[in-house]
Amino acid sequence: ITSNTLSSSKIFQKIKFKKTIHQFFPIDTNFFIKKFLNYWKPSAAFFIDSEIWPNTITNLKRNKIPIILINGRITKKSFNKWKKISYLSNDLFSKINLCFPSSKQSEKYLKQLGVKKIKFIGNIKFSQSINEKLLSSNINIKKFISFKKTWCASSTHKTEELLCGAVH
């Protein structure tokens, strides 16, 4: 599991998932992202909330690594900023293989920005039955991954490490 903060690393150390390690995710530059991907060779990348890292997403796609956005969230302000550079954002957002938006509004924005495969299951942060919703969503996440042991959850927050561990 990857994250960008010391606090999330400390939380991960307390949980102690078996057969799982924590790695800090690199800064979103081509040089560091390429080195990271070449070393870890993830089979899929899971992003949570509003994490849109252009260089990371571009390099993941270039390496044919599926990109899944969980609880995808985008504000009106952010949507308007992305729309101003639609010549870049449409290409970037179209690289996302699968998106579970957190709200109907985010679903609308993400579609307009270029995400093609979207399945709305609600905001999983407030869900009591995350696993049930994901399993009953009729989306087979396994077809997007090749069953390697390495994967990436970039820039997670305090409450998201448990979900990442459960998914892994």
Describe every region a protein language model picked out.
Residues 1-135, 156-158:
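Active-site and donor-binding regions of nucleotide-sugar-utilizing enzymes
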